[in-house]
């Protein structure tokens, strides 16, 4: 007869595990609320549960379930029996907002199956991107060709908020032309020229993406100061600029490719020129924080790259020849790593 298992009062509770586990439903709930335009409905006026359910043709129970998740993460609040939007939702979840985040949900809906446990397991065992990301022509190549606009809008959603903050965290007074390498929609160029009136920007990306960047520049009223330059950032020379910006570019690539970017910028910039890398950074031990660790899993499934620590990116810039290297938290989970060419 086997010995009885001894049990004791646990030393710690299991809340962190439940937080991860319940995230399986949290993201889809917010996505469905977004898809059903529940938040847009509440932008018109505060409404009660029954009014919301009736307006969207929902039974009370599912309407309440979605609203509860949205309220729990701070998108809506309940006062006097009526739900209304919080500043978080007004800033990021309404299409009319210049810092709209909803395109991230829309684009990831197209490839949501890629982030299944099976897909992640395959990525872990093979150390290779999965699904639509496994194209031999490069990460995202075939999917990107078909869904370039979707992806560009998604990256714009992720970038435009922090783009309105980081240019205030670093001295750009002496700089006149910013090269936005792999700049996508040009969100960071838009933010930089809006906040720094003496600055102009060039978005360097593939030709179809440059066309979209031009549309965004028009939309934000900065087309006279944000231009585009269709090019391959590996093969083609960089146009003249005294400020190089890389927003979510380094994390797409392994260290040797990132070192290539750092050296290419060092060789291209004039003395006094500056490089700025904009990423979510690991701590120096690469053990957190959790959002960055989770983002790193995204990179594992999607690209050959990874999230980096401030120590790793600083070392890359130093090895390339940059000096006056600084790391500055900017907005939310974002930071910049910056250096100057002597």
Located regions from the model:
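Alpha-helical subdomain
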Residues: 2-78, 172, 177-342
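Conserved Class I S-adenosyl-L-methionine-dependent methyltransferase catalytic core
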Residues: 4-8, 14-46, 54-55, 61-176
